[in-house]
């Protein structure tokens, strides 16, 4: 296990951070494709279309070809939301990390090992938190595939916890998709609670929609105070 350190983001980290973020998002595409295939509406669609071709044209070969191209199309479509998200982030908060995070009452950290950036996480104040709450939102938690299983992700989340606690925040919140099961497992193991769920990432609105889960971690002292 190679040693690592967590430090605040510096401008020289930019290319490595963006590369790690982009690769991490693309890793979710196979899981998104598998998730898509198991949806009832997808299975129905894959059954009805070839059956229609057999009934209309009487050709099983044409039906098999249809299934092949439908699967190929679904594979391409499954990756589009993640590609769009990366493109959006690179035009917004990730375009200038210093301005978006460090100069906006938040912060951004990297995990460094062997001179390379192997993990990232950011935190920003929530603009309109619930009444009586002061919340920080966690963004862009990512760890290089070669450095997972070393506790880096947990250490990065704890770094956000410490920063938020020191700044007087009552909660840390975040959002992630149902596709990212390893992230969901991590957050729940660290004490985050599911506080909401909504559908946002749509491949084809009438066919496939990925749900977004909202998580909240409330600091124990805050919970005791409310009691």
From Swiss-Prot:
GO biological process: determination of left/right symmetry; gastrulation with mouth forming second; heart development; negative regulation of cell adhesion
Keyword field: Acyltransferase, Developmental protein, Gastrulation, Membrane, Transferase, Transmembrane, Transmembrane helix
Subcellular location as annotated: Membrane
Residue ranges of domain N-acetyltransferase in the record: 69-213
MF term (GO), any: N-acetyltransferase activity
Pfam family, one: Acetyltransf_1
Alphabetized PANTHER family for the sequence: GNAT FAMILY N-ACETYLTRANSFERASE, N-ACETYLTRANSFERASE CML5-RELATED
Name by which UniProt lists this protein: Probable N-acetyltransferase family 8 member 5
């Amino acid at each position: 296990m190679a040693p690592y350190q967590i430090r605040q983001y510096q401008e020289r980290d930019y290319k490595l951070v963006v590369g790690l973020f982009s690769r991490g998002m693309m890793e979710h595409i196979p899981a998104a494709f598998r998730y898509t295939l198991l949806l009832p509406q997808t299975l129905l669609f894959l059954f009805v279309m070839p059956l229609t071709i057999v009934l209309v044209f009487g050709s099983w070969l044409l039906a098999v070809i249809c299934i092949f191209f439908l699967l190929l199309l679904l594979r391409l479509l499954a990756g589009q939301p993640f590609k769009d998200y990366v493109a959006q982030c690179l035009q917004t908060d990730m375009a200038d990390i210093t301005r978006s995070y460090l100069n906006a009452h938040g912060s951004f950290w990297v995990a460094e090992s062997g001179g390379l950036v192997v993990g990232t996480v950011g935190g920003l104040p929530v603009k309109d938190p619930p009444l009586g709450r002061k919340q920080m939102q966690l963004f862009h938690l990512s760890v290089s595939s070669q450095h997972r299983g070393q506790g880096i992700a947990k250490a990065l989340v704890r770094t956000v916890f410490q920063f938020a606690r020191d700044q007087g925040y009552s909660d840390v919140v975040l959002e992630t998709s149902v596709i990212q099961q390893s992230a969901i497992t991590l957050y729940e193991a660290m004490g985050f609670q599911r506080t909401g769920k909504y559908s946002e990432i749509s491949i084809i609105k009438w066919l496939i929609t990925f749900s977004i889960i909202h998580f909240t971690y409330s600091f124990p002292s805050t919970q005791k105070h409310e009691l």
